[in-house]
Amino acid sequence: MAYTSPPPSRSVLSNKAHRYRILLSLRSLLDRYLSWPLPPGPSVEIAIPSKVSKTPGSIQLYFFTAPSRPLCPRKQTQRLPPRPVLINFHGGGFSIGHARDDSRWAGTVLKAYPDAVVVSINYRLAPERPFPVPLEDGADAILWLWQEAQKYNFDKTRFALSGASAGGNLALAVPFRLHEELQKQRWASIGEEIELAGLVVFYPSTDWTRSRIERDATNPIAPQKSIIPPSLFKFFDDSYLLPAGLPKWPGTDRVDMSHPYLSPGLAPESLLLATYPPAVAIYTCGWDQLLVEGNTFRERLGGFVEEGKMASIGGFVVEDVIHGFDKKPSFCRGNKARDRMYGDAVNQLKVMWKID
């Protein structure tokens, strides 16, 4: 993806981000407090220090649990079955949004699996913290949860990731960064009994080699139906994709937009098979500029299943809906398309978590 003009200053982008965040938070409030059935709120919030990123700071983790199964340190005398964990990344173009925006998805998971724990990551946002900070915060959160697994009775072998839009990109790319980090001696204390059980991803970006115009061209109905104006897409890209921090082609100063950390759909087969769990589900939207690249990646992973290299690939196209359709306040009308997508995704988790 080439820049045709210098991006705006970081201060200008930060001012825009502040305004956009206020608007999105209002929409989220309408969904969380005025749309039925009401989703749950987080039961616990914990701040952890960033260790993976070179940019110091803290990362907020929001824990969602069923009322009957609160999050609390396990007593030595307790012998309860370890709990499966879903680690979620919210959307918002890496620049806006909040971990609470996915409360409805968390509630759907907990209704089906009351013993589960959903952890929504409030990763640090661009333009203040552009690529690769959100990606590194995701790896940091997983590493911390693995380290604390015994204390909170988490099942280290049943960690699944989920995310929508930009969060979907993170859910698909974080395993690569996590794999790189785990090669370092500093994480030896985590132990060997760790692995990701699955990925559940909603309308992700998977191929940053395509410009926004090129993405629209792959699905011409998308710009007609989208409620996201081109100016907002440009803001997202300018905020997150700060050229100085982007991957470069080896031995050059040219930005490599095909790098797996940006474009997980283009990752080499060897990396995918070394880092991905055996089960992945990708859901795409029929009226979305990201439809084709998401479908292409799902089909590519499906080829690994046919070759016996992965266990299962799920997900489908949700027809006649726009990007982010499940986050719109529904008030008393409900959202049948969202319910169908979330319902299927919950069934995918049953397979990933090996729940009878």
Model feature map: region roles:
Residues A2-K51:
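An N-terminal hydrophobic leader/cap segment in hydrolases
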Residues S9, L13, Y20, E45-D356:
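Alpha/beta-hydrolase superfamily serine-hydrolase fold, recognizing
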